[in-house]
C-alpha cells in the first residue's frame, strides 16, 4: 500500500490559519515587487531616453528583451522549485530581480541596460509561479480562487507604486540632484525588496504538499520536464494553457507596454497626470483581481474569465478609439480607464486553474513554463505596437489588446472546469 501523508495537509483545513496568511503575505509581497521592478522601466522610459540618447526601436527592444528573459526565468526557476522547494526558490527569484534593478541604476548605454534588464527578467519570470504554487498547494479548494486572487493584487499595486515612483519621485530626484540621477535613483531604491528574503527564510514554511511529494518520490522517476511532455493528457493541458496565457498576456502587454507614453505624448497629459490615469486603471485592476476570485469560486473559472475579458475589451476600445469624445466627459474617461483595469482581473485565473490541472510533481515547472513562455512571446509586443503606430497611431497599436482579450474569453472554454478540485500529494 502506498504510504500516506504523515499529517493533515494545510489545504485540508476548514478555514485559513495564521500559517496560510503568512504564506499568502510573503507570496503577495514578492509578486508586488516583481511586477514593480518589471514595470518601472515603462514609467522611466522618457528620462532614460533623454539621458542615454536611445531611439524608440532601442527602447522597444529593451522592453521586449526583458519579457523574453522572463520565459527563461520561468522555466529554470520552475524546474528548480519542483526540485529544491518553493520557499527556497522564491527567495532566489527576489534576490535576482532586486539585483537587476540595482544594476540598472549604473547603466551607461543600451547594451549595459539590456544585460541588467535580462537579469531582472530572469528573477521576475521565476517568482509568480512559485508564489502561486505555494498558495495553490496550501489553501483549501473551496476558497483557492479567492486567495489566489488576493496574491494577484500585487500586480496592479506594483504598477501603482511604479507609477508613483516614475511620475513623482523621479522628477523630485531629478530636480534635487540633476536629470541623470532622477531615473538612476529610482532604480537604486528598487533594491529594497531584497530585504523580504530575510523574512521568508526566517518565518515562512515550505509547502507541505511538496515536502510529502518529495518524501514519497523514488529514484527511478523520470525528470519533471520529460514527464510533463511525454504524458499525453498533461502535454495537451500544457499547450492549451500556454495558448490561454499567450493571448491574455498579449492583451495585457499591448495595453501596458506603451500606455504611460501614450497618455503623456499623444494625449497631452503631464507625467503626473499620466500617472494619475494609471492609478485609476490600477485601482480598477486591484478590484478586478479581488472580485475575479469571488466570481471564479462562485460561478466557475471559465465563466469568470469570459466576463472579465469582455469588460477589458470594452474599456480598451473606448480609451483608444474614442478618447477625443471621452475627454469632453471626464466621468466617462474615469469609468473606461477603470474598466481597463477591472478587466485585467482575469489574471487572477492563472493561479487556481494551473494549480488545479497539473499534478504536484510538475506543478511549478508547468506553471512557470506556461506563464513565462507566454510572457516571453511578448518580446514582439512593443515592436508590433511601434510598427502599427506608424500607420494608425499609438492608440491603434494599443487597441489590438482588445481583440486579444476577446480571444482569451473564448479560448478558456477549451480547458476543463476545475472549481473545487482538491490538490493532493500525488496528483490533482
Predicted regions and their residues:
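Helix-breaking motifs and short loop linkers at transmembrane-helix boundaries and internal kinks
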Residues: 53, 85, 106-112, 140, ...
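Cytosolic juxtamembrane N-terminal segment immediately preceding the first transmembrane helix
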Residues: 1-36
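C-terminal ends and interior cores of transmembrane alpha-helices
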Residues: 95-108, 311-326
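Conserved MFS/SLC helix-loop-helix module at the cytosolic interface between two early adjacent transmembrane helices
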Residues: 73-108, 299
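Central cavity-lining transmembrane alpha-helices of secondary-active solute carriers
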Residues: 64-77, 279-291
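Extracytoplasmic gate region of multi-pass secondary transporters
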Residues: 41-42, 234-286
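Glycine-rich segments within core transmembrane alpha-helices of 12-TM secondary carriers
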Residues: 145-170, 193, 371-381
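Cytoplasmic helix-loop-helix junction between adjacent transmembrane helices
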Residues: 116-153
